[in-house]
UniProtKB/Swiss-Prot annotation:
GO terms for cellular component: plasma membrane-derived thylakoid photosystem II. May be involved in photosynthetic membrane biogenesis. Keywords: Coiled coil. The keyword Coiled coil applies. The gene is thf1. Residues 183-213 form a coiled coil. This is Protein Thf1. The lineage of its organism: Bacteria, Bacillati, Cyanobacteriota, Cyanophyceae, Oscillatoriophycideae. It holds the Pfam family ThylakoidFormat. InterPro entries: Thf1 (IPR017499). GO terms for biological process: photosystem II assembly. Belongs to the THF1 family. Transmembrane segments: none annotated.
Length: 226
C-alpha cells in the first residue's frame, strides 16, 4: 500500500524546487494555497477539472500581485503545482481555455445551457462541456477553488452583474443548484474571497505609498547631500 503524502512532504518538495526566499506576507498566501491543494490531491473524492485549475491560477495571480521580484512568480507557481503532483503548464492552459470560452458566453446563456444540462447543449464551449459533465456526474467534490473558478468565469461573462450583490447571489444559487453543490458554502466562500481581495488591494496601496515615501525621502536626501 502506497504511503499517503503529507503536507510536510509537499512543503519540502516546494522549497526544493523554489529555493529563493519568499516575502513573509506572500509566503503565507503560497503556503495556505499549497496546503489546500495538497489536501485535495490526497482526497479520493477529488477530481481535477479546468474550472478548479482556473480557480488556482486566479487565486495565485490575484494574491501575488505586487510580488517582487516579479520574475520569481513563475518559479513559485511551478513549484506550487509540482509540489502536489500537478503540471503547472496544464493548469495555465486549462485556465486560459476557460477564460476564452467565457468570452463567448453571457451569464444568461451560461445559465440557460446549464439548466438544460444535456451534453448536446454544450456545443464546443469548454466551460459548458466541463460544467454539464459535473452536473451529470454521480458525485463531485466541491472545493473553494472551484467556486473561485466559477466567479472568474462570471467576471468574464458579466462583470457588472458581480457588482450587484442580489444578482450575484442569485446566479451563484442557480449554478449551485444545477451542479448539485452546497449553495450556502459556495456563497460564503465567495464572500470571503471578495473580502480578502479587498484587503489585499488595501495592503498593496499601503505598500506602494510607503515605497513612494521612501523614494521621495532618498531623493530629498540626495539633493541635500549635493
Amino acid at each position: 500500500m502506497d504511503k499517503v503524502r503529507t503536507v510536510s512532504d509537499s512543503k519540502r518538495d516546494f522549497y526544493t524546487k523554489h529555493t529563493r526566499p519568499i516575502n513573509s506576507v506572500y509566503r503565507r498566501v503560497v503556503e495556505e494555497l499549497m496546503v489546500e491543494m495538497h489536501l485535495l490531491s490526497v482526497n479520493s473524492d477529488f477530481q481535477y477539472d479546468p474550472v478548479y485549475a482556473l480557480g488556482v491560477v486566479t487565486s495565485f495571480q490575484r494574491f501575488m500581485q505586487g510580488y517582487r521580484p516579479d520574475a520569481d512568480k513563475e518559479s513559485i507557481f511551478n513549484a506550487l503545482c509540482q509540489s502536489v503532483g500537478g503540471d503547472p503548464q496544464q493548469y495555465r492552459q486549462d485556465a486560459e481555455r476557460m477564460i476564452e470560452s467565457a468570452k463567448q458566453l453571457s451569464a444568461q446563456q451560461l445559465l440557460f445551457n446549464l439548466e438544460s444540462a444535456s451534453d448536446s447543449s454544450s456545443g464546443e464551449n469548454q466551460i459548458l462541456q466541463t460544467l454539464i459533465g459535473i452536473a451529470n456526474a454521480p458525485k463531485y467534490k466541491y472545493t473553494r477553488l472551484f467556486a473561485i473558478g466559477i466567479y472568474t468565469i462570471l467576471a468574464e461573462t458579466d462583470p457588472e452583474m458581480l457588482k450587484n450583490t442580489e444578482k450575484r447571489e442569485e446566479v451563484v444559487k442557480q449554478i449551485a443548484k444545477v451542479l448539485h453543490l452546497p449553495e450556502e458554502k459556495m456563497q460564503k466562500d465567495l464572500d470571503l474571497y471578495r473580502s480578502n481581495l479587498e484587503k489585499m488591494d488595501q495592503l498593496l496601496t499601503v505598500i506602494e505609498e510607503a515605497l513612494q515615501a521612501d523614494r521621495k525621502k532618498r531623493e530629498q536626501q540626495k539633493i541635500m547631500d549635493n
